[in-house]
Structures are given as C-alpha cells and as structure tokens.
C-alpha cells in the first residue's frame, strides 16, 4: 500500500525510482479506508535526506500512511532551503489540536550539549508532553531517544570516550511484536558520542530493554504498552550515510574512528556493506502494523 505525502515533495521522485509506491494527496482522498496519520519531527540537519530515509521505510508496508512533517519554531534550519521548509513543513502550533496514530522524532547533532542548553529544548519538551495524550505510539530515534528517556523517566546520558560509529551486532533481549520475524541476532547502525546505560533503565519498572549489543549497548527500549519506543541507533540510515558522516568529520579535522563493520577491510575507499536493511524495514513495518494499526482507535479523537 502507498504512503501519502504532499504533492511535489522531492522524496517522491527518489522513492518512485526504488519502486516505493508514493501516493499524492489528490489521489489519496478517493480511498475509502482510513489511513494512518504519522507525524515526523525532523531535527536532522539534512532534512531532505532524512525524509527520504524515513519515507522509504514507512512506504514499504501494506498500510496507507499520511505523513505530516514538523519543524521547530524556536530553531531555524541552516542546512535545508527555507523554501523547502515553508512548502512542506508545518509547526507545532498548527498541529497541536490534532491527534496522530504515530509520531517519529529524529536524532539531532546536539548530543554533547546538556539537554537544557539545546536552543529548542523548551519547545521539544512541550511537544513530548503533548505526545502523551495526542499520539498513539511515538518512536524516538538516537538523540531523541536519549532526550525522551531523560524527560519522561529522568535517565541521564553519558559521554563516550570516542564517537561510536559503525554497524553492530545486536540480540533480541525480550519478546516483542517490534521484533516479530527477526532472527535472534541482527545488525544496526549507530552514530553518536553519548549513551544511556542499561543499569539506569533497569531501575525504571515501566521500561523494558528489547534489544541490545555487546559493543553498542542498549538499542531499543519501550514502555510496557509500546506507546513509547526509544531507538538509540539509526536503522533508517542508507548505505552511504555513515560514510558521508565519516568524511564530513575528518574534513573538520575531528578524530573519529573508521565506522566499524562497515567498509570492506576497513577501507573507506570501498563501497560500504549494507547489512541492516532487512532489520530496518521489518522493524518499521512491525511498528506500523502491531503497535499502531492493530491498536489505534478508528476515530482519531478517541486517542488519549
């Protein structure tokens, strides 16, 4: 089934070439079934690339999805043309009276700052608080996962000795519909300077660790109802994202490691090995199907 996005969004052409069925708003209104309403707060610098990555995963399911793109009013994007933002994005002020089946909050390159020093932190906390009763299931990715765990449960983040970058082997730690169809072990990308610790999460009765890695630590945490899902890695990343970040970092003279388990023979001149794609697609499909579609009320106004 298709994903419904605003007409003219650049991601449409890219995804159409990949065989992902993207439906325009005009065509979608003639469908009789109720689509899932998904909100995406895009905090990543390259918003267009992140749109493509997330829509690719949301569009590869049997469910029709309407996507609303959100940006922060208290932080003006510097790496995405303002024309793109004004055309395709909306603000929290414009959607706070609506309800959504699902919500994705992306990562952001601010993890070395204390949460309260992030310039849009106050706005983000307002949005996260709103999500409690106006969204059926919210997925927090990378820095957003750390921010959500801190805001809702008081779990701190800790700075790592060096950047964690690469693709790491994970194991399913607890049965969950999110990992239905997964093997016991799977691979997933990480790209971060900070972490949350297992022992802090274990102290919170409402939370469960669903997947983890010996090298990368905690990967997926959820509350008991799976209406809050915290993903510390980047399953949405495409083949070249870690490579592009690595070249960006060394171009800034940063001392970062070569992404682990990524380049053949750890040679950055070679094409990266894609080992997490099946996990990413299945994980997002399970979220849409089991955590949202099969549980969300038919009437959006009944979400609370």
Swiss-Prot record:
**Reaction catalysed by this enzyme:** L-homoserine + acetyl-CoA = O-acetyl-L-homoserine + CoA
Family matches, as InterPro entries? Class_I_gatase-like, HST_MetA, MetA_family
Which residues are responsible for catalysis?
142 (acyl-thioester intermediate), 234 (proton acceptor), 236
EC numbers, comma separated: 2.3.1.31
Top-level taxonomic group: Bacteria
Kind of enzyme, top EC level? transferase
Q: Which UniProt keywords apply?
A: Acyltransferase, Amino-acid biosynthesis, Cytoplasm, Methionine biosynthesis, Transferase
* Description of activity control: Inhibited by iodoacetamide in a pH-dependent manner.
Q: Which residues hold substrate?
A: 163, 191, 248
Location (main, coarse): cytoplasm
- Keyword set includes Transferase: yes
Q: Which Pfam families match?
A: HTS (PF04204)
Q: Which GO terms describe its cellular component?
A: cytoplasm
User: Which pathway does it serve?
Assistant: Amino-acid biosynthesis; L-methionine biosynthesis via de novo pathway; O-acetyl-L-homoserine from L-homoserine: step 1/1
Q: Where is this site: Important for acyl-CoA specificity?
A: 111
PANTHER family reported for this sequence? HOMOSERINE O-SUCCINYLTRANSFERASE
Reported function: Transfers an acetyl group from acetyl-CoA to L-homoserine, forming acetyl-L-homoserine. Utilizes a ping-pong kinetic mechanism in which the acetyl group of acetyl-CoA is initially transferred to the enzyme to form an acetyl-enzyme intermediate before subsequent transfer to homoserine to form the final product, O-acetylhomoserine. Has weak activity with succinyl-CoA as the acyl donor.
Family assignment from sequence similarity: Belongs to the MetA family.
Name recorded for this polypeptide: Homoserine O-acetyltransferase
Question: Which organism does this sequence originate in?
Answer: Thermotoga maritima (strain ATCC 43589 / DSM 3109 / JCM 10099 / NBRC 100826 / MSB8)
């Amino acid at each position: 089934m298709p994903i419904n996005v605003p007409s003219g969004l650049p991601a449409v052409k890219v995804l159409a070439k990949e065989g992902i069925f993207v439906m325009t708003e005009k065509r979608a209104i003639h469908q009789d079934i109720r689509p899932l309403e998904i909100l995406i707060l895009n905090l990543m610098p390259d918003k267009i690339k992140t749109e493509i990555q997330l829509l690719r995963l949301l569009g590869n399911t049997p469910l029709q999805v309407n996507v609303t793109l959100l940006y922060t009013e208290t932080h003006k994007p510097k790496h995405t043309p303002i024309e793109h933002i004004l055309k395709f994005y909306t603000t929290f002020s414009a959607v706070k009276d609506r309800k959504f089946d699902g919500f994705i909050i992306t990562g952001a390159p601010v993890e070395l700052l204390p949460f309260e020093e992030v310039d849009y932190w106050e706005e983000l906390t307002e949005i996260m608080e709103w999500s409690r009763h106006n969204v059926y299931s919210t997925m927090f990715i990378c820095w957003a996962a750390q921010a959500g765990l801190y805001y809702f449960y008081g779990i701190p983040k800790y700075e790592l000795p060096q950047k964690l970058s690469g693709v790491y082997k994970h194991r399913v730690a607890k049965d969950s519909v999110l990992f239905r169809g997964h093997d016991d072990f799977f691979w997933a990308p990480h790209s971060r300077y900070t972490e949350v610790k297992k022992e802090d999460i274990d102290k919170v009765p409402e939370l469960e660790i669903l997947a983890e890695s010996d090298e990368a630590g905690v990967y997926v945490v959820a509350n008991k109802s799976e209406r809050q899902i915290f993903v510390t890695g980047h399953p949405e990343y495409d083949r070249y994202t870690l490579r592009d970040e690595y070249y960006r970092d060394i171009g800034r003279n940063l001392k970062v490691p070569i992404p682990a388990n990524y380049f053949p023979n750890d040679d950055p001149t070679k094409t990266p090995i894609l080992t997490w794609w099946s996990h990413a697609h299945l994980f997002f499909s399970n979220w849409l199907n089991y955590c949202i579609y099969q549980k969300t009320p038919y009437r959006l106004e009944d979400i609370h």
